[in-house]
Amino acid sequence: MTDLFQEPKDATPLAPEERDGLRLSWVTTRADLNVAEQDNIDKGAAWAFRARRRDMLTVDFVLQLHKRMFGDVWTWAGHYRRTERNIGIAPYLIGVQTSQLMGDAAYWVQHETYEPIELAVRLHHKLVFIHPFPNGNGRHARLMADLLLQRLGVPALSWGGGSLNDLTALRRAYVDALRLADREDYEALIAFAQS
C-alpha cells in the first residue's frame, strides 16, 4: 500500500476523481508528490515574482497562479473545486466569493484600510477560508500574500520559517491561528506569518 494520498490529519483529502488528475506516472509515494509539487511551486513562484503584475488582485490571476504552481502535477490546477469539503464554502459559491474577495482586497490597498502585513494576512486567510481549489490552497494563499506585499514594497512573510506540509507543531500553530482568524481574531495569524 502506498502513502501517496495520505494527508496530515487536519488537511483536506482529495476526492477520487481529483486523485485521477495526477499527471506524473513516476509519482508513487507521498515523498515523490511533495518533491514534484515543490518543484512546480518554485517554478510558479519564480514566474509570479518576475511578472510583477499590477492587476494581481483579480480572479484571472488567482486561477493563473494556481495553474502555474500546480499545473505540471495536476490536471485540475487553476480550476475551482467541484466537490464539497469539510472546510471552505460550497463549490457553487467559490467564483462569486473569490471575485468579491479580490474586489475587497483592491479596495483595502487603494484606501489603505489595513497596514500592509495585516492586509496580506487577511487576503491569505480569506482565500484559505474560501478554499477554492482541490488542493494547494494554503500554499497558493501564502504566495498571493507575499506577492501583494512585494507590490506594496514590503518584504515577504516567513510563515513560521518551516514546512507546513507535514503534521508538526508548526503546522498545528498555523491551523490554530487560521481558526482564530475565522472568528475575526487575526493577531495570532499575523504573529505566525512574521515568525
Model regions and ranges:
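FIC/Doc superfamily catalytic core
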Residues: 1-195
